[in-house]
Regions:
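Active-site-adjacent structural segments surrounding the nucleophilic cysteine of cysteine proteases
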Residues: 12-195
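Extracellular hydrolytic enzyme modules, especially secreted metalloproteases
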Residues: 108, 188, 204, 213, ...
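An exposed tryptophan-centered "aromatic clamp" motif
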Residues: 190-201, 234, 256-258
Length: 294
């Protein structure tokens, strides 16, 4: 009984265990890892978890904090990485979309920026040649984004875009998604299908340099659990979506934390077209020895 009675839920959609969003796959891996650690190290249940189990046994419901109601999800967007979101990403003849994926880091950035609808216009330019590991002689051409000459058309960025969406909407969302990738020097996938990746630690500099956001910081979870939870709760209570990332055996994934319910389950938008978005525990046993960042 050292594990929380409820680890997650969604208020809509269906769940297919064989086809989950990479972000949720990461969370499930973290839960599994934490439980394995607890079994091997005789971890004793946290008093709060004991209280939750008693509440379930007594009333069939978990013990909620009645000081606040559910907040969020703050981000109404359900964006993804494939076509048409990747319209302006590098061409890839081996990909069914004929373009590489946007990348989870850029998709998370873009959804948070859409929430703030800022800036109207960017600042400066960035050019780089994407690094490509073990690409067998293949190389991507130089990627360039002229942020300073781009007006971001927030009014034409709906919650989702489709193949048949107006071209103005597709171009507005795809431009922002691509620019976020260039801003963090995205490493785009090659034919091996590893996906497009970037370091979340580059986001604070990118958003201040190219998008005129205030100074922000990238934090890791190698601090006390209580401090980590307090920072998350403070951000959500202030209606500030949080960029969230973590690494596990399945790889590194980035997504958005943008809500919280009275049971302190947090809403995660996994950047997979709305698939598997829901309220989840950032922990399974009130013990954290794995790393995530925000």
């Amino acid at each position: 009984d050292y594990m929380r009675p409820v680890l997650g839920y969604s208020e809509n959609g269906t769940f297919d265990i064989d086809n989950v969003a990479p972000g949720l796959a990461f969370m499930m891996g973290v839960y599994e890892d934490a439980v394995e650690y607890a079994d091997e190290n005789d971890v004793v249940a946290d008093p709060e978890i004991i209280s939750e189990w008693k509440s379930v046994e007594r009333s069939g419901r978990t013990k909620a904090d009645n000081r606040f109601e559910t907040i969020g999800p703050l981000c109404t967007t359900k964006w993804s990485q494939s076509w048409p979101y990747n319209k302006f990403c590098p061409v890839a003849s081996w990909d069914s979309d004929e373009h590489v994926p946007v990348g989870c880091v850029a998709t998370a950035m873009a959804q948070i920026m859409r929430y703030w609808a800022h800036p109207i216009q960017g600042t400066g330019t960035e050019s780089y040649t994407p690094w490509c590991f073990d690409c067998y002689g293949f190389s991507y051409p130089q990627q360039t984004a002229n942020f300073g000459e781009t007006v971001y058309d927030w009014d034409n960025m709906p919650d989702k875009i489709y193949d048949n969406s107006p071209v103005e909407q597709i171009d507005a969302v795809a431009t922002l998604s691509y620019h976020c990738g260039v801003a963090v020097k995205m490493k785009y996938e090659h034919h091996d299908g590893d996906g497009s990746t970037a370091r979340g630690e580059h986001i604070p500099e990118a958003v201040t340099t190219y998008f005129s956001y205030a100074q922000c910081e990238f934090l890791d979870m190698f601090q006390s659990y209580d401090e980590w939870m307090d920072k998350l709760k403070e951000s959500i209570i202030r209606r500030i979506p949080v960029y969230y990332q973590g690494c596990y055996a399945s790889g590194c994934h980035a997504f958005v934390c943008d809500g919280m319910d009275p049971n302190e389950l947090f809403h995660f938008n996994y950047g997979w077209g709305g698939k598997n978005d829901g309220f989840f525990a950032p922990d399974a046993i009130q013990y954290s020895h794995y790393g995530v960042g925000a």
